[in-house]
Regions:
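N-terminal secretory/targeting leader peptides
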Residues: 5-15, 23-118, 127-330
């Protein structure tokens, strides 16, 4: 039986046909891509995916995971998967899927989840299936699992414990309009500043705060200028494990089944890894005296202020049915 061999380099992808036929005895090779090194949670999730596919398929198959952005960045990975060349599987931010689905970035929006338990329930209940279906139809890229789990909090140059203290707080937010709208609704004064300028902006009192996951706070050393971490838990990341639909259609049925099963399980594994590492990093930074975690007492009240903005945003992008189900899930 002749099987497909996936192109293993960008140079080859540019000149080769979508696939080449291999010797009947040669096992299939699938290519993955990730921006990070082996220590990152995304790598660990994709390696688990490979391990599980081998387990469930039970036949010879090879995987090549291209690390450290050697095949570009996540935006390029998604484009390659849509085209059926160079990259067969990856973990990609929903923001890079917006060309094909207006609702895609919504699944990574702020104030969508009540807490980590609610986030996990939403993913386990497969409430994001309409978004996945739209992306599969329009981009021919399958969302076979959901990793992520980094919780974003506000790092500030002063303690912030409630809505009164957070009122008027000048905080850097991401460029997507929904971030400024929701933070304004919560009473803050959001400002869009380039990520690599946040440290100096806080140091020079242009802003008083920013928001990120523990890994970002650690890597950028934001704790040096903003050592107070308000535990707002305003966003919990979702990072889909993606698989090229064009590649998937060429696979034998038993391998397709293995890919689907492995994707779901690897996503759950990735969520556990990232959420636990998030906590470990916070504990380590706090123990070393780099930052202090500050409980935020008005988390529920803040979400109540933001919910109408999120509801309007969901309706605007055609995700109102999904939003209603997420809010209703207990």
């Amino acid at each position: 039986m002749k099987r497909r061999t996936i192109v293993t380099s960008l140079a080859a992808a540019a000149v080769a046909a979508p696939f080449v036929k291999a010797n009947a005895q040669a096992p299939l090779t699938l290519n993955g891509a990730v921006q990070f090194n082996d220590d990152h949670a995304f790598n660990k999730a994709l390696l688990k995916f490979e391990e599980l596919v081998k387990k469930y398929y039970g036949k010879p198959i090879n995987f090549v995971l291209h690390r450290n952005s050697s095949l570009g960045l996540e935006k390029q990975y998604f484009e390659y998967m849509a085209q059926g060349k160079a990259v067969d599987y990856s973990i990609v931010s929903p923001a890079h899927m917006s060309t094909f689905s207006k609702a895609a970035p919504f699944i990574d929006a702020p104030f969508l989840f009540r807490d980590l338990a609610h986030w996990n329930k939403v993913l386990d209940a497969d409430l994001l299936k309409p978004v996945a279906d739209e992306i599969a139809q329009k981009a021919d890229v399958m969302l076979i699992g959901y990793a992520g789990g980094g919780t974003r909090n506000i790092f500030a140059n002063k303690p912030v414990t409630n809505l009164t203290e957070i009122k008027g707080l000048k905080v850097r937010v991401q460029g997507a309009p929904i971030w400024s709208k929701t933070f304004s609704a919560a009473g803050m004064a959001p400002t869009v500043i380039a990520y690599n300028e946040v440290y100096n902006a806080i140091q020079n009192n242009v802003i008083a705060a920013g928001e990120n996951e523990a890994a970002g706070v650690e890597t950028m050393k934001f704790y040096e200028v903003a050592p107070h971490l308000a535990m707002t838990e305003h966003a919990i990341t979702i990072r889909p494990i993606c698989f090229s639909g064009k590649t998937f259609k060429t696979l034998p049925k038993d391998l397709q089944d293995a890919v689907i099963k492995a994707g779901k399980e690897a996503g759950a594994y990735g969520r556990q890894i990232e959420s636990s590492e998030d906590e470990q990093k916070l504990v380590a930074m706090e123990k070393s005296g780099k930052l202090k975690r500050v409980p935020f007492k008005d988390r529920a009240a803040m979400k109540k202020l933001v919910d109408p903005v999120m509801e309007a945003y969901a309706k605007e992008i055609g995700a109102d049915a999904i939003f209603s189900k997420i809010v209703a899930l207990n």
